[in-house]
């Protein structure tokens, strides 16, 4: 957001999320902005417009973290050393064997409610 200019979706996000999350984030942005605009034009209440960026950024950073997590867990860089490879393998094994980790992965993959 810059003054009265509001960005949403890919226009607002520097790094696109992986794992088919881009459209979900864009829709969430627009949903929040639409509700804020509706309140503003119905009653003059600017609170939703003022909190738009902060509200969206909380979700965006969680999505970016999840994208980073998935990418670093599932893709091997060409210059990966054996220590990093073992850390990556341990993370994948943890996600595959822990109910708590699986639940967290599912929550982040399927979607985040307003954070």
PLM features: what roles do these ranges have?
Residues 20, 35-115:
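C-terminal helical "tail/cap" subdomain of flavin- and related membrane-associated enzymes
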Residues 1-22, 44:
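FAD/FMN-dependent oxidoreductases across multiple families
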């Amino acid at each position: 957001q810059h003054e009265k200019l509001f960005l949403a979706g890919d226009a607002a996000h520097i790094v696109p999320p992986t794992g088919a999350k881009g459209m979900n984030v864009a829709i969430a942005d627009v949903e929040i902005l639409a509700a804020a605009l509706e309140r503003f034009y119905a009653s003059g209440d600017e609170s939703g417009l003022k909190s738009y960026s902060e509200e969206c950024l909380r979700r965006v950073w969680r999505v970016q973290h999840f994208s980073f997590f998935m990418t670093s867990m599932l893709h091997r860089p060409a210059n990966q050393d054996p220590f990093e490879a073992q850390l990556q393998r341990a993370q994948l094994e943890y996600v595959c064997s822990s109910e708590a980790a699986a639940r967290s992965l599912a929550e982040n993959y399927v979607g985040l409610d307003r954070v």
